[in-house]
Structures are given as C-alpha cells and as structure tokens.
C-alpha cells in the first residue's frame, strides 16, 4: 500500500511515481524522466519516506 502523495506547490498527484519507486523498485532517475515539473521532481527526490514499520508497541505505564 502506498499513501497518497500530492505536490504542495502545484497540486499534482504523484502517487503513481511513488508507487513505481517503492513497490516496483524502479530507479529514481528512470521515474523522474516522466515528471516535468521541477517542484514535483524535488519532492520525489527528497521526501520519499521508507516503508513504514507498522508493528504496534505497548504503551508504557508510568504510574
């Protein structure tokens, strides 16, 4: 599952590019060939999060 990613500058949905990076394991250089806006290219290059660890840890009881 890939969380939606929208460019905050131009409003373009770049979830498909993020899917290609995280799930399909396509190189960043290859994915950026199809992205024209510099703002979207920058966001994809710098703000891609690693896959999240969804394990739940118990809360600590401080009392």
Curated annotation (Swiss-Prot):
InterPro entries: RNA_pol_7kDa_chordopoxvir
Main localization, broad class: virion
The keyword Transcription belongs to this UniProt entry's keyword annotation: yes
Catalysed conversion reaction: RNA(n) + a ribonucleoside 5'-triphosphate = RNA(n+1) + diphosphate
Annotated localization: Virion
GO MF term set: DNA binding; DNA-directed RNA polymerase activity
Signal peptide: none
The protein's Enzyme Commission number: 2.7.7.6
BP GO terms, sorted: DNA-templated transcription
GO CC annotation terms, alphabetical: DNA-directed RNA polymerase complex; virion component
Gene induction: Expressed in the early phase of the viral replicative cycle.
Entry keyword set: DNA-directed RNA polymerase, Early protein, Nucleotidyltransferase, Transcription, Transferase, Virion
Family the UniProt entry places it in: Belongs to the poxviridae DNA-directed RNA polymerase 7 kDa subunit family.
Protein task: Part of the DNA-dependent RNA polymerase which catalyzes the transcription of viral DNA into RNA using the four ribonucleoside triphosphates as substrates. Responsible for the transcription of early, intermediate and late genes. DNA-dependent RNA polymerase associates with the early transcription factor (ETF) thereby allowing the early genes transcription. Late transcription, and probably also intermediate transcription, require newly synthesized RNA polymerase.
Oligomeric and partner information: The DNA-dependent RNA polymerase used for intermediate and late genes expression consists of eight subunits 147 kDa, 133 kDa, 35 kDa, 30 kDa, 22 kDa, 19 kDa, 18 kDa and 7 kDa totalling more than 500 kDa in mass. The same holoenzyme, with the addition of the transcription-specificity factor RAP94, is used for early gene expression.
Protein name: DNA-directed RNA polymerase 7 kDa subunit
Organism: Myxoma virus (strain Lausanne)
Native organism taxonomy: Viruses, Varidnaviria, Bamfordvirae, Nucleocytoviricota, Pokkesviricetes
């Amino acid at each position: 599952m890939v969380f939606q990613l929208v460019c905050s500058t131009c409003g373009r949905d770049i979830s498909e590019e993020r899917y290609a990076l995280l799930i399909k394991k396509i190189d960043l250089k290859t994915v950026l060939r199809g992205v024209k806006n510099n703002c979207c290219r920058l966001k994809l290059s710098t703000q891609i999060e690693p896959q999240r660890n969804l394990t739940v840890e118990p809360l600590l009881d401080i009392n």
